[in-house]
Structures are given as structure tokens and as C-alpha cells.
Regions:
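Structural preference for beta-strand elements that scaffold enzyme active sites
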Residues: 12-19, 44-48
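N-terminal beta1-alpha1-beta2 module of alpha/beta enzyme domains
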Residues: 1-14
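Internal, glycine-rich beta/alpha segment that forms the wall or movable "lid"
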Residues: 23-103
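Short active-site-proximal "capping" loops at secondary-structure junctions
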Residues: 1, 21-22
């Protein structure tokens, strides 16, 4: 919401978050949010994805710390796949599969 407000009030600055923690976020929703912001801002949105360093909060999101690396790699793979395809067929290990999903 803050980035959308910045997009409305400015015309040249790049719009990005410090980091979007994919291990505890849904990559499809992250893509949709940033794609919408990019459209509304005339192509000024930039996404920075990361693993997250504050591990104590991960169990609150149902992330098993023993699978920490797997969560990030699996969700980054999905984020990149969604960015390249309008219709998504995908099956990973940390999220429900997608079949013919329009994004």
C-alpha cells in the first residue's frame, strides 16, 4: 500500500521493498502484487526477494526450519515461473500445486 501511494505521488522514483521474504510469503501473491504495482506505476516496480534472517518468526508461518533452504528455493522457482508464464502448471514441495492457473 505504501508503494502504491508513492507511485501515485511520484513519476520517476523506482518502487521496491527492502526485501520480500519468500520463505513465508506466497510467491503467486507476491508476483500479482508487484505486477499490479508495476502496471500502475508505469514500469517502476522492482522486486527484491530473499530468505529472511529473523528465523524466530518462521514457525509462526508454518515454516519448518529444517527445510529453510528448500522453502526459499522452491518458492523462488515458482516466482520465476509465474513471471514467465500467463498460465501456470507447477508442482513443488512447499506449496499446493498449480494446474492451468491464470496469473
Amino acid at each position: 500500500m505504501v508503494l502504491a501511494a508513492a507511485a501515485r505521488e511520484t513519476s520517476r522514483i523506482r518502487l521496491t521493498s527492502t526485501v520480500t521474504v519468500l520463505s513465508s510469503a506466497d510467491p503467486v501473491r507476491v508476483f500479482e502484487d508487484f505486477a499490479t504495482l508495476d502496471l500502475l506505476s508505469g514500469g517502476r516496480a522492482e522486486l527484491t526477494a530473499g530468505r529472511g534472517a529473523y528465523l524466530e518468526s518462521f514457525p509462526l508461518f508454518g515454516v519448518d526450519l529444517d527445510r529453510y533452504d528448500e522453502y526459499f528455493e522452491d518458492r523462488l522457482d515458482l516466482l520465476l515461473h509465474v513471471a514467465e508464464h500467463e498460465v501456470v502448471d507447477w508442482q513443488g514441495t512447499t506449496r499446493a500445486p498449480l494446474s492451468g492457473a491464470g496469473v
